[in-house]
């Protein structure tokens, strides 16, 4: 099977998200054939991502303590989003600290992905202000990763990682493939990879740009449990090494607690719950503290009220522990 055959049988590319992510870089790179496909589908008119410098240096513990404080990379003030008469988000106030890892959970249709699309500038707020500030006050370079890897099947793994970049980026692309453990598959086609491997390629494609903000829209939802845990470890390791800000949307409460410094719950278009995660990394999922915190978040999602006891030593907007924590529920999907 050749790349030409794959290109001929793939058909038109659909999905404004993919187009917005890749169209502008591909046009700038001069790949006229691929750019024509994106342009035909309207992708060239989607808002381009801002370019920026490298993520800030500094002590990660200090960065985490500052999450949501003065040094914010993303700030939303009274942001609302409507589609016609339907209000999806209403008066959202949110500050995301530079270098922090924030997870967003909530029931289906609550506005999680809409909030992510606003931060990605794939949508514009109906009201309110959104400010994204990069290192030194410049533009905040932003990349996004979806549940579907969205790889171009007529391009090799290496070529997919290099999308939007010139040929001089080949060494950088190979280096980031090595970081995600797929350098040996650089010349393979996407169809030859497993689902988890395709997501690793998608992650590499985002990280090769050295973003300051990485948005994750349920990127692991279609993977099996063991592959998800492996991907959790990979994402956490790369986050700690590259020091970008991460915003994750997920239905999986355990995933949210395992990865984030802070878990937000969206209900009826508003941030209804803001829970800090004061657990050491890497997270010990079998520990009582992890189980109690997971259960607290899950019960809050399911009941719609902050009635569950706090995790031991949990410090956050909800206050300190209020007694012995209940056992963790076997259910961890907030649907």
Curated annotation (Swiss-Prot):
ATP binds at residues 106-113. Pfam families: ABC_tran. GO terms for molecular function: ATP binding; ATP hydrolysis activity. It catalyses: ATP + H2O + aliphatic sulfonate-[sulfonate-binding protein]Side 1 = ADP + phosphate + aliphatic sulfonateSide 2 + [sulfonate-binding protein]Side 1. It comes from the Bacteria. Its EC number is 7.6.2.14. It is found in: Cell inner membrane. It is a peripheral membrane protein. GO terms for cellular component: plasma membrane. Keywords: ATP-binding, Cell inner membrane, Cell membrane, Membrane, Nucleotide-binding, Translocase, Transport. InterPro entries: AAA+_ATPase, ABC_transporter-like_ATP-bd, ABC_transporter-like_CS, ABC_transporter_ATP-bind, P-loop_NTPase. SMART domains: AAA. Residues 74-293 form the ABC transporter domain. Residues 29-61, 308-335 are annotated as: Disordered. Belongs to the ABC transporter superfamily. Aliphatic sulfonates importer (TC 3.A.1.17.2) family. Part of the ABC transporter complex SsuABC involved in aliphatic sulfonates import. Responsible for energy coupling to the transport system. The complex is composed of two ATP-binding proteins (SsuB), two transmembrane proteins (SsuC) and a solute-binding protein (SsuA). This is Aliphatic sulfonates import ATP-binding protein SsuB. It comes from Burkholderia pseudomallei (strain 1710b). The gene is ssuB.
């Amino acid at each position: 099977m050749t790349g030409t055959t794959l290109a001929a049988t793939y058909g038109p590319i659909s999905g404004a998200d993919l187009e917005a992510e890749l169209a502008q870089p591909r046009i700038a790179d001069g790949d006229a054939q691929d750019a024509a496909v994106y342009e035909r589908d309207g992708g060239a008119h989607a808002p381009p991502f801002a370019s920026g410098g490298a993520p800030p240096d500094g002590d990660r513990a200090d960065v985490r303590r500052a999450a949501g404080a003065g040094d914010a990379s993303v700030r939303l003030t009274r942001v609302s989003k409507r589609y016609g008469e339907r209000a999806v988000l209403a008066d959202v106030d949110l500050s995301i600290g530079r270098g922090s890892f924030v997870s967003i959970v909530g029931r289906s249709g609550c506005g999680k992905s809409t909030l992510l699309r606003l931060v990605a500038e794939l949508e514009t707020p109906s009201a309110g202000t959104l400010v994204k500030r990069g290192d030194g006050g410049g533009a905040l370079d932003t990349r996004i990763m979806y549940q579907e890897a969205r790889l171009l099947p007529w391009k090799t793994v290496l070529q997919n990682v290099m999308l939007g970049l010139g040929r001089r980026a080949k060494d950088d692309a190979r280096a980031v493939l090595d970081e995600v453990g797929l350098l040996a598959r650089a010349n393979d086609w996407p169809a030859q990879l497993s689902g988890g491997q395709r997501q690793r390629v998608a992650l590499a494609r985002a990280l090769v740009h050295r973003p300051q903000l990485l948005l994750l829209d349920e990127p692991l939802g279609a993977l099996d449990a063991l592959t998800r845990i492996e991907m959790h470890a990979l994402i956490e390791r790369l986050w700690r090494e590259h020091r970008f800000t991460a915003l994750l949307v997920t239905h999986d409460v355990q995933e949210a607690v395992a990865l984030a410094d802070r878990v937000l719950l969206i209900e009826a278009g508003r941030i209804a719950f803001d829970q800090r995660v004061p657990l050491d990394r890497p997270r010990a999922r079998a520990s009582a503290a992890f189980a109690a915190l997971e259960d607290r978040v899950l019960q809050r999602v399911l009941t719609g009220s902050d009635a569950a006891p706090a995790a031991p030593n949990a410090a956050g907007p909800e206050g300190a522990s209020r007694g012995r924590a209940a056992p963790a529920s076997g259910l961890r999907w907030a649907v």
